[in-house]
Each structure stands twice: as C-alpha cells, then as structure tokens.
C-alpha cells in the first residue's frame, strides 16, 4: 500500500514538472521581451511606448503602456470613427459633400488639394485622412464634428477617458515633451482600436468600413508592417511629428491566429530629430515573435 501511494505521488509530481517548466518559460519569455524592448529603446536614443493585445486570450504586452505620448496622425482614426458613428442613425452623413477652399489647405494635403473645385464627401475625407494621412481632410472632419473637443467626447463615449484631442492639424503634431495636449497612452489607444475594429463600438457596417480604410493605408509599409510576416493582413494608421515622433497603430490578422492589436509610439529628445520608422518595425517583430 505504501509503495502504491509513493508511486502515485511520484507520478503526480512528474506530471507537474512540464507545467512548471512551461510556466517558467512563459515568464522568461515575457521578461525577455521587456529586455529586448528596453535595449531597442536605449539603442534608438528616444522613448518607446508599446501595447499589444492578443485577442486569443486577452493577454497584453506593455512597455511604457500607461505613459502619455503625442498621438499625431494616429488620432485620425478616432475622428473617422466619430463620423462613422453618426452614420449609424443617418446613413447619408458619409455622403455629405464639404467645400474645400484654398485657404483650408495645410501642409501635407495630397488628396484634398486636388479637390478645390469639387469638394469631398465625408467618406472621401475619411479615406484621405486614414489612407494618405491628409491633414486638411482631418481638419475638415474635425470642423464638421464641432471641434477637437467633440472627437475627445466620442472617445469618452466608447470608454476612453485617456484620449484627448486639443488642436487641429498641423499644430497637434508639436509633440512637446511633457505637453499633455493631443496625447494618449499606448494601452488606451490599443483598447479603443480594438473596440472600434473588432468590438461593438461601431455598427457592423461602420466597423467593416473602418477596417477597409485601415487595410488600404499607403503610409505604413516601413513601420509595423515591416516587422511582420508578409502573409499577415494588417490595417494601420501612422503618425509623425516634431521631436522625431514616429507612431503607428495597427490591427493584425496573423495566419491561423486570433487578431492582434498593436500600438507603437516613439519620440526623441531633439525637436528636429528625424522619423525612425525602423524602430516601430523592430518593436513589432519583438512582440510578435513566437506567435
């Protein structure tokens, strides 16, 4: 009887070893990711913020996830989503045509500058803002919605009390260290992007439209997308500003895996520092390796 009991205990202990090893491996992996991100940040000479949400199990990988960063053009997603939200009760909203005057044009307006005679619909402006990062398109959306505070109010309506839009383009890209205007945190943005593209913050049709716009982005090839396997589907929105601020937020559909939501924000000490898209690509590779 004693021998049988000892054998049972030994078998149970042996069975537990792989679980303990697996658990230790998971923790080691998480620690390794943090160290790799810290090393990347140190090599890059700036401040890096990362938030990854794995929707397969709701796990999160965060690096400075609760620190504020200037959003720059990644905030255009929230403005476009606010327009889409209005179209749930009034489908014709997206077809509303807005006049575009020469005096409306600001720096980097590759699409709107071609429509001074015809104007553009809110749907066209949303696409221009998201897929080409057209700044005048963003300003026209903000104006239609009633000002930056209305975009912030929409963010709050979906549970995001961190996001704040205070100015229009291009002033919102000043990215002054310590300035809370036009900022959010990587985690807050990741949670909002998940709600907007994978959750129920928008109606089914509006959500599908937002995803389509993001997948058609033309500005993200060297950022998050560059750090992922080419076979993975990605919808993203980039951003850039002073102090070498370089941003990208993305929804990712890996092969044979639940979607991922990834936010990468990077900023530097010098006001005239150059954009560093390769840092975002490297961060994306670090946090998605092994999936």
UniProtKB/Swiss-Prot annotation:
Q: Which residues bind substrate?
A: 237-239
Q: Name one Pfam family in it.
A: Beta-lactamase2
Any further remarks?
In strain KH66 OXY-1 is known as OXY-1a. The class A beta-lactamase family has a specific amino-acid numbering system, sometimes called Ambler or ABL numbering and often misspelt as Amber. A multiple sequence alignment was used to derive a consensus sequence and then the consensus was numbered taking into account insertions and deletions. This allows use of identical numbers, e.g. for active site residues, despite differences in protein length. UniProt always uses natural numbering of residues, hence there appear to be differences in numbering between this entry and some papers.
Catalytic activity line of the entry? a beta-lactam + H2O = a substituted beta-amino acid
| GO MF assignments | beta-lactamase activity
Q: What is this protein called?
A: Beta-lactamase OXY-1
The GO biological-process annotations, alphabetized, read as: beta-lactam antibiotic catabolic process; response to antibiotic
Superkingdom per UniProt = Bacteria
The active-site annotation reads 73 (acyl-ester intermediate)
The leader peptide range reads 1-24
Query: Which key words are in the record?
Result: Antibiotic resistance, Hydrolase, Signal
* Family of this protein: Belongs to the class-A beta-lactamase family.
What organism is listed for this UniProt entry? Klebsiella oxytoca
Q: What does this protein do?
A: Hydrolyzes broad-spectrum beta-lactam antibiotics. Active against cephalosporins.
Effect of altering residue 278 to K?
Answer: In strain: KH66
Query: What EC number(s) does this enzyme carry?
Result: 3.5.2.6
């Amino acid at each position: 009887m004693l021998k049988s009991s000892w054998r049972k205990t030994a078998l149970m202990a042996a069975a537990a070893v792989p679980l303990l090893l697996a658990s230790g491996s998971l923790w080691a992996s998480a620690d390794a990711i943090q160290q790799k991100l810290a090393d990347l940040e140190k090599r890059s000479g700036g401040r890096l913020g990362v938030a990854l949400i794995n929707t397969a199990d709701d796990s999160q990988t965060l690096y400075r996830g609760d620190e504020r960063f200037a959003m720059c053009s990644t905030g255009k997603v929230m403005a476009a989503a606010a327009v889409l939200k209005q179209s749930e009760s009034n489908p014709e909203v997206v077809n509303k045509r807005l006049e575009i005057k020469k005096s409306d044009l600001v720096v980097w307006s590759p699409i709107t500058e071609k429509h001074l005679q015809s104007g553009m619909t809110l749907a066209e402006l949303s696409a221009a803002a998201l897929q080409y990062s057209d700044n005048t398109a963003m300003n026209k959306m903000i104006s239609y919605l009633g000002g930056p505070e209305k975009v912030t109010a929409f963010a709050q309506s979906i549970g995001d009390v961190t996001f704040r839009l205070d100015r229009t383009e291009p002033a919102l890209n000043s990215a002054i260290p310590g300035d809370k205007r036009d900022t959010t945190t990587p985690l807050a943005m990741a949670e909002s992007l998940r709600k907007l593209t994978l959750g129920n913050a928008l109606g089914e049709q509006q959500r599908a439209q937002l995803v389509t716009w993001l997948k058609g982005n033309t500005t993200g090839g060297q950022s998050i997308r560059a750090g992922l396997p080419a076979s993975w589907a990605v919808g993203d929105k980039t951003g850039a500003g002073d102090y070498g601020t370089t941003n990208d937020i993305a929804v990712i559909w890996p092969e044979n895996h639940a979607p991922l939501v990834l936010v990468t924000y990077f900023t530097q000490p010098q006001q005239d520092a150059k954009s560093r898209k390769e840092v975002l690509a490297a961060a994306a590779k670090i946090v998605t390796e092994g999936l």
